[in-house]
Amino acid sequence: MASLRIAPFALFLFLAASVMFAVEKTEAGVIPCGESCVFIPCISTVIGCSCKNKVCYRNHIIAAEAKTMDEHILLCQSHEDCIAKGTGNFCAPFPDQDIKYGWCFRAESEGFMLKDHLKMSITN
């Protein structure tokens, strides 16, 4: 009777291990973007995907294929581009030197946070 209870669990572990090893064999070990973003935004934004032409692509692919900065709202060449577009205040370049555009981020340094914290009045 105990073996009947263990059999489904063993099958589950076998299937989980099979999926784990299958994913490791893909490029970079992660499931690539590719879902549609017609009605909802990209679900895979946590792994670096963004919507372009109603399909989710990796951010570095969007930047590498771009001919102008206007092709995506997060593309930039300087910090001023990000500020002007309103998409952040920091333009981060990609590690690949062949990609001429960077990606806009909203970044706040600890110095600004400390400065604001020191402005607070002390009440007793």
From Swiss-Prot:
Prosegment location in residue numbers: 60-124
Tissue-wise expression: Expressed in stem, shoot, root, leaf, seed, pod and nodule but not in flower (at protein level).
Family per record: Belongs to the cyclotide family. Bracelet subfamily.
Signal peptide start-end: 1-28
GO biological process terms, semicolon-separated: defense response
SUPFAM superfamilies found in the cross-reference section: Cyclotides
Post-translational modification: Contains 3 disulfide bonds. This is a cyclic peptide.
Function, as annotated: Probably participates in a plant defense mechanism.
Domain text: The presence of a 'disulfide through disulfide knot' structurally defines this protein as a knottin.
Cited PROSITE patterns: CYCLOTIDE, CYCLOTIDE_BRACELET
UniProt name for this protein: Cyclotide cter-A
Native organism taxonomy: Eukaryota, Viridiplantae, Streptophyta, Embryophyta, Tracheophyta
Paired cysteines (S-S): 33-49, 37-51, 42-56
Cross-link (Cyclopeptide (Gly-Asn)): 29-59
Origin species: Clitoria ternatea (Butterfly pea)
Keywords for this protein: Disulfide bond, Knottin, Plant defense, Signal
UniProt superkingdom: Eukaryota
